């Protein structure tokens, strides 16, 4: 009898949510700092507003309940998605209401995209450039037009409808965030059910997501793009639903549609090769990947992810258990291996976030390289300003995510790391030999720095002395990147053996022919030489220094020889109290702060290298006689081998457009260039300054106000050391990024 009762208990469905756990109270939310007892009392000094901003999203400081923290993060994700949908809706609405999309669609190789027209109020209509086809406006470089063309959007109505769909989804997400915190909040065990989460994300989001996108590409994008490529007027092309509902319409373009699903069920999948292809290379009409290749790709990865989504053990006792995998994962030199990591990852969101940010950041940088090497959207490869913008955008995103990974890794070490859980496992062993790790990494940084800059300084000296025959260059002492060249040739030759039916190489960056659209170069083989070898080692240097700072911040987050009780001081602290000299700037937060500057150095060199290399060796025109002429005539190989060359032939020569922009349609970038320099310089006031100086100044100003009986009730206080550094770093990065933005776009739009 007891056995039957037990079985019945097991069969009853688990209740995975709590009903109405937190009341919806606008009265409570109306109190600034309601999440903290001390902040809710209101401000006594100006420090209050800084603490309010520092702690408002630090859910760990609001409560110690892991369940409540998990719910807040989950709810915040819905809020984030809501904002993303509003933003996307705005992009589509601007495309529908204010853009020249349909004009651009008629001639994408000559007409420039715009989604904003400036109204003439104080003469700023000068910003409306002539974009071709009788349209005027501010040129945009987001790539949305190319994405819409690839999606099969042919008119403004479709953009309006999509914008409305985005608003509806934004509302749904906002409601979801409220509902899953206030009405039906998941229990902690739901958040910790990693196998179900993996199955859901792999099979649902990635698998079915890819499948639905493949379906859209096959039924909508392919036929519409085929007709557009053939020069059919967009106004006469049938609407998407007609292609979906009318099989005859599709079979005129792709004959295999007449056969329906029979080839699928009879395993004669080759019948579908008219719309699921494996061509390789680029479409010569659009300069982008073949749409049929892209559809095939999404169909293939959807199958892989749907299979992957059935790998983990949930209800039926079959499949993998993550805990079992981690606990069993032990090598001969790794002690107790990965034991303890499952417990860490199911109780620390910071640990999860650290891993995911590192992977996502790296992926973003990989995406940046794919966007130019394998351009996915029609005509995007000949829109040079857009290509430069997208590369820069994705590398910046990657850099910030990787620094964020270090920040949350350190927070995990301080707040969530339980030493007894990690005895002799891989993480414990990593921490125990951190001195060897950091000192060796430091040696690598010194080696890379001295040798890579040494090569440049040698070249500058030789050129200054007129001894060009003694320089490291392609025409004197060669330092050819032989491994990179070998990989290029390997990738050029491989498809003939590994994919015999492919028509071309994966990417023309490796080798092959020049692909030009409307006489503009979309992609061509990228020749690598001594200049690339040298700047590559600068990349290696800056990446390793960034890694040194960030890794040291994580590995020494809990303690060090200097401060054995660092974990008790928390994530951010200015110094280890008075009377302990030399203990400032040692908190994990300070490592993130320093890491941000090196990340900025690192990404700047990357985007400068990309911009100059593409203008010198890839971007340009092809004449009727098949003569290739590049934007800056191939000066990279001889100029990028000296520091003076970088300053004179890249920064100074290419800044001429932004400096001389006044009185033209790009004059806003000239103003932005100056304003961003100002913001950058303003940051130095915070970074080079002592707190005591400002406190002293404030007190004399307060004295003057008191004399005049106008002293404020909230006492002014100088920024703390940490706050000052945060403000300084923020303005330094904002100023630097906006300066680069103005410099790049004014240059790219002028040559584009």
From Swiss-Prot:
Binding site for phylloquinone: 694
GO MF annotation, one: 4 iron, 4 sulfur cluster binding
SUPFAM superfamilies attached to this UniProt entry: Photosystem I subunits PsaA/PsaB (SSF81558)
UniProt binding sites for chlorophyll a: 685, 693
Transmembrane segments: 73-96, 159-182, 198-222, 294-312, 349-372, 388-414, 436-458, 533-551, 591-612, 666-688, 726-746
GO (cellular component) term, any one: chloroplast thylakoid membrane
Biological process (GO), any one: photosynthesis
Catalytic activities: reduced [plastocyanin] + hnu + oxidized [2Fe-2S]-[ferredoxin] = oxidized [plastocyanin] + reduced [2Fe-2S]-[ferredoxin]
Compartments in which it is found: Plastid, Chloroplast thylakoid membrane
Chain coiled-coil ranges: none
Protein name: Photosystem I P700 chlorophyll a apoprotein A1
EC id: 1.97.1.12
Entry membrane topology: Multi-pass membrane protein
Organism: Cyanidium caldarium (Red alga)
